[in-house]
């Protein structure tokens, strides 16, 4: 065989190998489902549960935040005063309840009995005086006005006696169950007010609810804040979720737990790894923010993909290409 022919065959073989390799690579790249999504934006608006003057803020925008970290404080003074007042209220209610349970002392009962005897004597005198006045009035010795004054004194003495007798009876039988129950309810109410005062004072300290990065610092020390008004906005950096959408035709490929490859423009040759964590049970129209070659009017299902090897380069809102090919199972 002539030398030029051999060279030609060799070149043809090389071209065939290159073409075959290119076709194989492209077929591997195009194999499987490809979706487009974004890293979920997850933020928390942090606020005080109570209102007041902002005394301090210990963090600034961009700071890394740890769960349980003290972020700021309100002026404690009004809430410390309310707490002392609530403690005093509990002491008063407790003393009243204890008094109701203990009943009356022997000395108090003796004093009440003496008051009854005194009232009885006063009534007897008033009754006798009234009787004498009646006789004098019949004989026209006194006027009708004198008789009426005697009757009024007798009635007043009778009322005083009745009051003293009722008091002695109460002292001897003890407090009524209804009075004891009312005193107990007052004590429980005072304790509840104390617990609320303690909670309010505790809530003058702002605690980070989770790890993350501080996005915004909305107010500055010295500001008067209403309860619930936003003080800080925290970006939740872990776990990292990717939101993507799949149409009904490919829904069967998106079982929860399936391994996924995630590509970003910043590192196209080094994918992140993830797993499908959630598939929405209801369809929706494709959101405008999603990059997709299909019609945006298609009904799709939302996916949540949990990134298992996320780093700080994977930022919230970043566009992501989601690959479902077999490479995800082996990497």
Curated annotation (Swiss-Prot):
Regions annotated as coiled coil: 107-208
Pfam families in UniProt: HlyD_D23
Record keywords, A-Z: Coiled coil, Periplasm, Signal
Cysteine-cysteine disulfides: none
Signal peptide: 1-19
GO cellular component labels: periplasmic space
PANTHER family: EFFLUX SYSTEM COMPONENT YKNX-RELATED (PTHR32347), UPF0194 MEMBRANE PROTEIN YBHG (PTHR32347:SF29)
Protein name per the record: UPF0194 membrane protein YbhG
Lineage of source species: Bacteria, Pseudomonadati, Pseudomonadota, Gammaproteobacteria, Enterobacterales
């Amino acid at each position: 065989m002539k030398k030029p022919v051999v060279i030609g065959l060799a070149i043809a073989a090389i071209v065939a190998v290159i073409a075959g390799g290119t076709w194989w690579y492209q077929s591997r790249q195009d194999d499987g489902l490809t979706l487009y999504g974004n890293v979920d934006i997850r933020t928390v608006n942090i606020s005080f549960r109570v209102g007041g003057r902002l005394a301090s803020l210990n963090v600034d925008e961009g700071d890394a935040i740890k769960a349980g970290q003290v972020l700021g404080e309100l002026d404690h003074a009004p809430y410390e005063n309310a707490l002392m007042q609530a403690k005093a209220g509990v002491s008063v209610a407790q003393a009243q309840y204890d008094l109701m349970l203990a009943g009356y002392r022997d000395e108090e009962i003796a004093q009440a009995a003496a008051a009854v005897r005194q009232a009885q004597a006063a009534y007897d005198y008033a009754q006798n005086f009234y009787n004498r006045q009646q006789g004098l009035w019949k004989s026209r010795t006194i006027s009708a006005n004198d008789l009426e004054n005697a009757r009024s004194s007798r009635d007043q003495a009778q009322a005083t006696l009745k009051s003293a007798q009722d008091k002695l009876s109460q002292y001897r039988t003890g407090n009524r169950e209804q009075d004891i129950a009312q005193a107990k309810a007052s004590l429980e109410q005072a304790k509840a007010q104390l617990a609320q005062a303690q909670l309010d004072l505790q809530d003058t300290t702002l605690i980070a609810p989770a790890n993350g990065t501080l996005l915004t610092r909305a107010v500055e020390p010295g500001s008067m804040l209403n309860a619930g008004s936003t003080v800080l906005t925290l970006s939740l950096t872990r776990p990292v979720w990717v939101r993507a959408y799949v149409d009904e035709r490919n829904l069967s490929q998106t079982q929860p737990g399936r391994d996924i490859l995630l590509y970003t423009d910043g590192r196209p040759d080094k994918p992140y790894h993830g797993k499908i964590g959630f598939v929405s049970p209801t369809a929706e129209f494709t959101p405008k923010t999603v990059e997709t070659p299909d019609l945006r009017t298609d009904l799709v299902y939302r996916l949540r993909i949990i990134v298992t090897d996320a780093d700080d380069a994977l930022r919230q809102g970043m566009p992501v290409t989601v690959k479902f090919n077999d490479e995800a199972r082996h990497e």
